[in-house]
Amino acid sequence: MSTEGSGPVRFPAMEDAVLERWEKEKTFEQSISAREGKPVYVFYDGPPFATGLPHYGHILTSYIKDVIPRYQTMLGKQVPRRWGWDCHGLPVEFEVEKAMGFKSKRDILEFGVEQFNDECRELVLKYADDWRGFVNRMGRWVDFDGAYKTMDNDYMESVLWGFKTLHDKGHVYEGGKIVPYCVRCQTVLSNFEARLDDAFRPRRDMSAYVKFRQQDRPDTFFLAWTTTPWTLPANVALAVAADENYVCIEHGEERLWLAEGCLGGLFDEPVILERCTGAELAGLRYLPVVGEVIDASAHRVVTADFVQMGDGSGIVHIAPAFGEDDALLGQQYELPAPNPVRDDGTFSDAVAQYAGQNIFEATPRILADLKSSGLLFKQEQIEHNYPHCWRCDNPLIYRAVESWFIRASALREQLVENNSQVNWVPEHVKEGRFGDWIRNARDWAVSRNRFWGAPIPVWRCDQCGTVEVMGSIAQIEARSGRKVEDLHVPHIDEHRFACQCCEGTMSRVTGVFDCWFESGAMPFASRHYPFENKQEFEQTFPADFIVEYLAQTRGWFYTMMVISTGCFEQNPFKNAMCHGVILAKDGRKMSKRLKNYPNPMDLMQTHGSDALRVALLASPVCKGEDIKFSEESVRDVVRRYHLLFWNCLQFYKTFTEIDQFSPSGDLGQPLDNVLDHYLLHELAALESDIKMWMESLDFSKIYSRIEVFINVLSTWYLRLNKARIWRDGLDDDKRQCYEVLHYALSNFARLLAPFMPFLAEAVYTELGYADSVHLQDWPSIDRQYLSYELADEMSSLRNLIASVRNVRETNGVSQKFPLRSIRVAGIEQAVLERYAQFLEEELNVKQVQWAADADEWAQPVVVLIFSLLGKRLGPAMKAVTTAVKAGEYVIDEQGGLVAAGQTIQPHEFERRLTVRDTLNNVGIVENMVVWLDLDIDASLKREGAVRELNRRLQDLRKKAKLGYTEKVDIAVLGGAYVDEILVHHEDWLKSQLLVQSLLRSDLEAPLAVDEVELPEGDPVRIQLRRSVLA
């Protein structure tokens, strides 16, 4: 069967049938109601923006969010799975602006804020049905009908409560700070928004070395370097490093001041006229390069500890309105902070020559003007990492803006303490990416000068400036005397009321909440706490589990932690998982424009959702690493997991139907067949391992272990049990085999349920169970079946088989030719004899013999571990190496090696076996040495030929779509070599194929025909049909 679905079973169609069953039987709802009154397992589902269709990042996160609840449900817990929609903020506004053709904020104001917000409300759930269909097709169970929306009044009211709580605890203030600012969206961004995803990306800009003329020395200039020439109109100071040396050099008829440490990068053989420290330059005055002198405190040299001697000139131009370090320095020296840039990123009339021009577009003109006035020393284009808006992709600026802030810096100690109580996956995130971020938490600007969002609940008096913060709709209504119908602007701004301190009127301040503040309030806002569901919230907070991709350590994870710490002094979650990013096959970001990734819905309809689930969750992306995704990885899963397991199931069903077997549940005690015991050991070990690795959320190990079990079942247990199953009749031994198989298949389906929910459901149904596998408890496999000694024996046998096959391949001896014998040393004789028959059948060997030793085939060698010995032995290493190669060493009583007068400790060398030089028919694996008799005589060649003939005829049976029990007629048409083969092996060939008649002439109306190349003789034609005598 191909993974695309041609053949006996098409897995995507099978999944569609399972989906129909779940919908019809309300299986998800049953799984919730069946656990009523049980302990609740809480996981927070980070609400996606509903402004587009799901991508592979959403899909990966959703699969994890499905595995965990399914698993916890099977452990007996109730796991509510409520969906949520992130409705507010720049993502939605930006999409509406694009749809309406708006270019600026002014367009919105002219259109009307109320109408604009109505458009936002309409857009928000435009893709809701598409999301629902997509998530359902993935097989993820979630409650869409009870979804919360951040735009609902109930949710927003809780957001207001959270802000007021933070305010009342002293964690909120209003102030002007340097913050990331988008001139296109005309709003503040938080410091973590400026670092989301790939917000910092390469950008080419013009940098300039500008000459600032010293006030009292017209021929002398301070040389300063800037990468933002547009900030020069706001310059008020030049900063130098107090302890560094600065020099004044001759440059034509001019003199230039710069750091001595920066000379080499700018001048070849400078003539130094003066030398002093930066501290000695402090206080000198200069003339502005753009505009006029601002006031007496400006345009002077000051010292700063952030001035570095790397790139540039060692003199930094200071514009306090456009840099955090600049602003702090301005406060220190009481410098003015002129801001000649409007909200839309154009220069104001304060800079007449550039008024109305975009700051970036004006840069070339600024530089041209500096050049014409003789103040431009040098300009060059640089490529640097520069922050961009996470929604509109325009470059950000850092700008002094009035905003409402959460005092996150004051919460650092509590944030660190709360983080210490969280289990992070990967573990390094705890003290690394997330830990570093909260240890250096900066105050969070939570207000946005936008329209579509929960309102900042602050009212200010127009006369005395008194401020009131509202934490509920009831408070607003009580003060305004009007009913609150909608908390959105402009409706909320109709609520004005008298000031209690004077005769003034209180009106709401402008601005709405950062949408990250709203999503960070999700744990309580989604429950409308504290206005409703108080007990429910308190009993389910903090969450047991959350998962998002790694960048959310500076997004949703962070905002939840800040708000929870500030409001409740509590960590909001106990376990947090961060996954990596899924890149296209070519290693680039997935792009609709580049079409460098397969459509996920098409992929699921081609290979199935379970296959995509395994391909993603088994990959390193679940350990926080980025991966390159390709459709081949999904196709490979179908081959390695689906097909093997499904074929095992069909094999079981076919033969149990033939034998009219019905499982009793009695496995038989004690188990007298070693293969039965081994299969049940593997099942019990699998269940134990899954539980262990679910504790650490190591999905890659779980899926790897699942694959191991499928291989043990398919290529070991069933393969070695074929003779046992194929024999006629249903004796006790065969019945036990069937009982063990049924037990293993049904319990494996239950173990598989959280990880491959569609396949598990289909298999469980095929086994005759009426109830869904997802309504079952987690299986408890009897620990009496665990036998790691037996597992080690089986592992050794598989390794031995692999070694024999490798020696065959190396010597060009086909696996189809039987060997007279192999001899094995390094294994217990009893163990080898116990499994000799298995090995003879699997390896196509006449006789497996035990050997007491392997001295004539292999010799011991000592391998020194140079990485450990090199430093310790030094010059003596050479003599030791020579002695060991010559065999001139002894092993002492402690297991150490003594050579050339040096003692090598046991951990500093290894003792290995190696094949003797003259032998090519010997293999070594673990401590076993196997010798193969590779002499293939005529009789062995005939056996090999008839085995190949049988294999090809079996293929014809499949091609003709004949059942296992149907008898056939075959024709084998060839020369004398075929006659010779059939003389010796005709009866065996007929027994293998259920042959009624074997003819040496053409069949009438054959169902299938083929041509076979045998090791010797001419090509052989083979034909097959359903037996006419059957």
Curated annotation (Swiss-Prot):
Compartments in which it is found: Cytoplasm
Any single biological process term in GO: response to antibiotic
Top-level division of the source organism's lineage: Bacteria
Any one Gene Ontology cellular component term annotated for this protein: cytoplasm
Motif placement: 'HIGH' region: 48-58
GO molecular function terms attached to this record: aminoacyl-tRNA deacylase activity; ATP binding; isoleucine-tRNA ligase activity; tRNA binding; zinc ion binding
Keywords: Aminoacyl-tRNA synthetase, Antibiotic resistance, ATP-binding, Cytoplasm, Ligase, Metal-binding, Nucleotide-binding, Protein biosynthesis, Zinc
EC number: 6.1.1.5
Main location: cytoplasm
Entry-linked CDD domains: Anticodon_Ia_Ile_ABEc, IleRS_core
Short sequence motif 'KMSKS' region: positions: 589-593
Known catalytic reactions: tRNA(Ile) + L-isoleucine + ATP = L-isoleucyl-tRNA(Ile) + AMP + diphosphate
InterPro entries in alphabetical order: aa-tRNA-synth_I_CS, aa-tRNA-synth_Ia, Anticodon_Ile_ABEc, Ile-tRNA-ligase, Ile-tRNA-ligase_type2, M/V/L/I-tRNA-synth_anticd-bd, Rossmann-like_a/b/a_fold, tRNAsynth_Ia_anticodon-bd
Group of enzyme by EC: ligase
Cofactor field: Zn(2+)
Family: Belongs to the class-I aminoacyl-tRNA synthetase family. IleS type 2 subfamily.
Record note on domains: IleRS has two distinct active sites: one for aminoacylation and one for editing. The misactivated valine is translocated from the active site to the editing site, which sterically excludes the correctly activated isoleucine. The single editing site contains two valyl binding pockets, one specific for each substrate (Val-AMP or Val-tRNA(Ile)).
Biological role: Catalyzes the attachment of isoleucine to tRNA(Ile). As IleRS can inadvertently accommodate and process structurally similar amino acids such as valine, to avoid such errors it has two additional distinct tRNA(Ile)-dependent editing activities. One activity is designated as 'pretransfer' editing and involves the hydrolysis of activated Val-AMP. The other activity is designated 'posttransfer' editing and involves deacylation of mischarged Val-tRNA(Ile).
Additional comment: P.fluorescens NCIMB 10586 possesses two distinct IleRSs (IleRS-R1 and IleRS-R2), each with a different level of sensitivity to mupirocin. Purified IleRs-R2 shows no sensitivity to mupirocin even at a concentration of 5 mM, 100'000 fold higher than the Ki value of IleRS-R1.
NCBIfam families named among the record's database cross-references: ileS (TIGR00392)
Cited PANTHER family: ISOLEUCINE--TRNA LIGASE, CYTOPLASMIC (PTHR42780:SF1), SOLEUCYL-TRNA SYNTHETASE (PTHR42780)
Subunit record text: Monomer.
Name assigned to this protein: Isoleucine--tRNA ligase 2
Organism this protein belongs to: Pseudomonas fluorescens
